Amino acid sequence: MLNIRNCLAALCLVVTVTPVQARDYHYSDSHLHFVDFFQETDGMQQLVKAMDESNIDHVMISGIPVAKKWHENEPKRPRYYAGDDAAVYWYSATDVLVAAALKELDEDQRKRFHPFLSGFNPNDKNADAHIRRMLDLDPGLWQGLGEVFTRHDDITALTQGDTPRANNEALTRVYHLAAEFDLPVMLHSNITSKRERNP
């Protein structure tokens, strides 16, 4: 019995003094917004640099489908969407910003990005026509749709208009269009409230 204990103790000692080898992990990011809620960004070169430093080889990239309003009654510009009670509104130009940034890249860098169209109002039955126009403007650029905001709690409370639902008529039309173009759709839908402590 003493021999077994001595062997185990020796094994533990070997394990603890053996140098740990760092692994060369590489990652894919499945959810990255290129812009903030004011549709501003640090730019594509900063993003590529951060990806390189973090070993991120591929990224799903989208804009943000809403923009934060700076209300005339607020003396200072809010720093974030939750900075005050001013509304956010649907903002379709977010996709133009993403597309323009991707076009700055050379072909090898561009292959690292998987852009999703997000700049549409998911309550509007015109959304599918808008998405089709965007797909036609840049054939082959867009690889998916989303992130589509449905219930996003504090953002939902600030969004002008009706709260989107994943099963509304407008999004059903978007799903059919996505199927036609063989595009995945990414939805954001919280299941509990951030404002209240119960589901």
Predicted regions mapped to residue ranges:
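Flexible, glycine-rich surface segments
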Residues: 197-199
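Hydrophobic h-region of N-terminal signal peptides that target proteins for export
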Residues: 10-21
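Bacterial N-terminal signal peptides that target proteins for export
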Residues: 1-8
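Active-site gating/metal-coordination segments in enzymes
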Residues: 74-193
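An N-terminally biased module of ancient metal coordination in phosphate/nucleic-acid-related enzymes
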Residues: 22-100
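Short, solvent-exposed loop/turn segments at secondary-structure junctions
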Residues: 36, 193-195
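Intrinsic low-complexity/disordered segments
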Residues: 18, 28-30, 185
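Alpha-helix termination/capping residues and helix-transition junctions
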Residues: 14, 24, 53, 139-142
